[in-house]
């Protein structure tokens, strides 16, 4: 059975607190923190984008497992903030890690679930025998307009999974998807910041798709919440995934290890995948995981995963764990944040 052979993540070390953002806009920081349960968020440095984050995540995956990059037959990078409108991030990653010229490569877009769509495609290609290994990445440097509610959550980070049949540390037992035309969140071509239809954000979009996908997976696998050691959902904020977990009947001990948004914000395409990476950092053989992503527009991908004995053979500390990246912090104020995010335009448009 195909599954995750190795994994790696990257989270920028710069962080800003909602208190600092609220100070600039005259908001009540306690109201913000209690409302969305975000205590800090990651900020990309001026030289960091989806390409560099993807490369770092992929390199961290290769540090944990010595795989010949030339045996990677496909690379798919999911993001809604690719650095180029026309020029694939996937080929940049491939060149940086040394893959072969014979390669399936593409950039994916489906809001925050583009990375998990890549996981599904890579798994299908491995299962069919088209490739030996495939690399699926979810990464973003997400945007929020100055003063907008998204500015408190939109952050940066990403995760890479190499999927194959040999030496899997976590078998992907099954995957499924749901999708509908739901106008909860969008950004038109050329616009720097997204718009959101607030009344569609909760029940019609996130909860409808995440809850339905999770229930469909449990029905397919004939499982119940108590059968899982861990559960991880897409995390637009700290409140939505905890509410979804409780609605489905999961307990805090099952979702706490994958809940990262309170500390790094919403990494969009990297969100659920980075939560899963955090779980793999601490999981043991036999652990059963339910993972459900969400992308605005809208859809969800669900995965039923079982950790194998090979997880103990892997030296997970060969690459930075999520815990280590959470501890590696450099705080910035709003001025530095605005500068790094290119929100300050000077002169005749020179950033």
UniProtKB/Swiss-Prot annotation:
Pathway: Metabolic intermediate biosynthesis; (R)-mevalonate biosynthesis; (R)-mevalonate from acetyl-CoA: step 2/3. Keywords: Acyltransferase, Isoprene biosynthesis, Transferase. Its EC number is 2.3.3.10. It holds the Pfam family ACP_syn_III_C. The keyword Transferase applies. It catalyses: acetoacetyl-CoA + acetyl-CoA + H2O = (3S)-3-hydroxy-3-methylglutaryl-CoA + CoA + H(+). Coiled coil: none annotated. InterPro entries: ACP_syn_III_C, HMG_CoA_Synthase, Thiolase-like. One of its GO terms (biological process) is isopentenyl diphosphate biosynthetic process, mevalonate pathway. CoA binds at residues 199, 239. GO terms for molecular function: acetyl-CoA C-acetyltransferase activity; hydroxymethylglutaryl-CoA synthase activity. The active site is at 80 (proton donor/acceptor), 112 (acyl-thioester intermediate), 234 (proton donor/acceptor). The keyword Transit peptide does not apply. Gene3D superfamilies: 3.40.47.10. (3S)-3-hydroxy-3-methylglutaryl-CoA binds at residues 112, 153, 201, 234, 243, 266, 296. Disulfide bonds: none annotated. It is an enzyme of class 2 (transferase). PANTHER family: 3-HYDROXY-3-METHYLGLUTARYL COENZYME A SYNTHASE, HYDROXYMETHYLGLUTARYL-COA SYNTHASE. Belongs to the thiolase-like superfamily. Archaeal HMG-CoA synthase family. HAMAP family: HMG_CoA_synth_arch (MF_01409). Interacts with acetoacetyl-CoA thiolase that catalyzes the precedent step in the pathway and with a DUF35 protein. The acetoacetyl-CoA thiolase/HMG-CoA synthase complex channels the intermediate via a fused CoA-binding site, which allows for efficient coupling of the endergonic thiolase reaction with the exergonic HMGCS reaction. Catalyzes the condensation of acetyl-CoA with acetoacetyl-CoA to form 3-hydroxy-3-methylglutaryl-CoA (HMG-CoA). Functions in the mevalonate (MVA) pathway leading to isopentenyl diphosphate (IPP), a key precursor for the biosynthesis of isoprenoid compounds that are building blocks of archaeal membrane lipids. This is Hydroxymethylglutaryl-CoA synthase.
